Amino acid sequence: MYYLRGWKQLIDRVVVFTGSKRDFEQYLENNLPEDEITIPFMELIQHYNARLRPNESGVGEAALQKNLYVDNCIVGADDYGSVMPHVLSNFVNIVTLNYQIGVLYVQNPPRRVLESLQSALDGDIEYKGSSYVELTRTVLKTIYQNLDNDVLGQDQCKKQILSGMYRLTTGTHGKPVVLMLYGPSGVGKTESAKSISKSLGGDLLRIQFSMMQTEEAFNYVFGSEHSKSSLARDMVGRESNVILIDEFDKVNPAFYNAFYELF
């Protein structure tokens, strides 16, 4: 295949970043020199589409055949949903068809994209990612202080939340802690989750299950087309290790088994 013949000459480095959009953008800001040529992945795809249909693009075929050099190409997590499935399966071929790239930055690649990269590079890939706050007794104290400032009342509930989270400080618990917050509207359930998430370094990942009453819920939880949103994609892109599944009781009970396995 084409990339196996000249891959090392076409892309100097590949960096796979796993984590949130915020952290990915911060990583790029710290690592991309301002004087270098950087293009987004979708600009590369536009060039690829023009080469497939030169008569429609209005660009001369000779110009389309030239290999262009760029210092950096950035593939964001949202880009995969904007291309056809064959682009993911032939990712390396398509990326290198018209471009010679210094550094290819890839955020949260789908399995097919990662396999394409690993096959071409024989595992020679740099892996970076978001780092999450480790829960310690000191962090628990900070969480409690912030909860006390952000949520009025509910003193007993706050203590129960901290008690439930304490076992994560021992380092012996392999699964996430699941806390059920229940009560009428306006008592601080969502605000408590938001406060904890901010104390742990980022915005809350909130999954609104009351909006999922049809096949949409099944596709979101178990996965569907790459262009559709999914629980797995949202979890990989989270900013903190706090996930709020809001109005869990309003989803079809058939989905409960999936979460019993997960948690």
Identify the residue ranges that each predicted region occupies.
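A short, well-structured beta->alpha microelement
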Residues: 2-6, 21-23, 28-69, 79-88
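Walker A/P-loop
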Residues: 2-41, 175-207
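Conserved ASCE P-loop NTPase core motifs with emphasis on AAA+ ATPases
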Residues: 111-148
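Sensor-1/coupling segment of RecA-like P-loop NTPase cores
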Residues: 76-84, 91-122
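Conserved catalytic network of the ASCE P-loop NTPase/AAA+ motor domain
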Residues: 6-9, 57-69, 93-101, 170-174, ...
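Pre-Walker A (pre-P-loop) alpha-helix and adjacent loop at the N terminus of AAA/AAA+ ATPase modules
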Residues: 137-178
